[in-house]
A protein has these predicted regions:
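An internal, D/E-rich "acidic patch" concept
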Residues: 1-54
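Short, hydrophobic secondary-structure boundary micro-motifs
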Residues: 3-6, 18-21, 87-88, 103-105, ...
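Hydrophobic alpha-helical segments of integral membrane proteins
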Residues: 4-17, 27, 31, 71-78, ...
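Membrane-water interface segments at the C-terminal ends of transmembrane alpha-helices
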Residues: 8-10, 74-103, 119-123
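Residue-level signal for pocket-adjacent positions within structured domains
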Residues: 12, 16, 22, 26, ...
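Alpha-helical transmembrane segments and their lipid-water interface positions
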Residues: 14, 87-88, 137
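Alpha-helical transmembrane segments of integral membrane proteins
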Residues: 35-68, 107-246
Length: 246
């Protein structure tokens, strides 16, 4: 058992993930063929969901207790509550079956990324919006914000120059963690849209009991999340001098 474990770890260090029982091809080759698709989907999803989430969060946070805040947070809670597979089926029925303006299954073109990206990004945008709102509210209580307002600086300048910049330091952490989730947590969405990514490859491997592929994919997902967390910690230290000093 010890010898087999050492042999397996040695193979991993050399980039050898074993041979797929289903295709008789090296698992490394299968992963390499789909890894780029998963990264592309994750990047597009994170890009638009971050922008939408931050804007909704700022909108709600700067209007705390008003109808703008209640509207924004109601939308955010709805986005978190809706299951991704239900959103996916709804999009397919509307845009692919009824309106016929988007493909039912996903390829690698930009148009085919729209529905999977929306399905994945709704919940992520909602999480970012709620976190941004909390961060905005906390920064608004700081003394330098009150000082800026007392000097007669325009409210828009105070919000975007002082409040927004400082609140984004903590939001970066959430965005980074969501990117790690997108790289490893898009299994359901990729399956619904038949998207050729690592998530759908994992489902195919499970259905065929392709244990070398399953083991390798779980390992890759874990390493991705660890690396993303490390990068987020480094970025947080760079953006926040207090963390760097500690």
């Amino acid at each position: 058992m010890l010898f087999r474990s050492v042999t397996y770890v040695t193979g991993l260090l050399k980039g050898n993930l074993g041979t797929s029982l289903r295709t008789k091809q090296p698992v490394t080759k299968e992963v390499a063929g789909r890894f780029g698709n998963t990264v592309r989907l994750a990047f597009v999803t994170l890009l638009w969901s971050s922008v939408v989430g931050v804007l909704f969060g700022v909108w709600s946070g700067t209007h705390r207790g008003k109808w703008q805040d209640y509207t924004g947070m109601t939308i955010a809670v709805s986005g978190i509550s809706l299951p991704s597979f239900w959103i996916g089926f709804l999009l397919i029925m509307l845009f692919a079956v009824k309106l016929r303006i988007l493909p039912t299954t996903s390829g690698t073109s930009l148009k085919s990324l729209i529905m999977p990206s929306i399905t994945l990004g709704v919940g992520i945008a909602a999480v970012i919006a709620r976190f941004t709102r909390s961060s905005i509210i906390e920064v608004l209580k700081e003394d330098y914000v009150r000082t800026a307002r007392a000097k007669g600086i325009k409210e828009k300048v105070v919000i975007w120059k002082h409040v927004f910049r400082n609140s984004m330091i903590s939001v970066v952490t959430v965005v980074g963690l969501q990117f790690g989730f997108l790289l490893g947590g898009s299994v359901v969405t990729e399956t619904v849209f038949a998207y050729p990514g690592l998530g759908s490859l994992l489902i195919e491997s499970v259905n065929y009991r392709d244990y070398p592929a399953i083991q390798s994919l779980i390992l890759i997902f874990s390493l991705q999340f660890i690396v993303i967390n490390l990068i987020v910690d480094i970025l947080y230290a760079v953006l926040n001098p207090e963390i760097k000093l500690q």
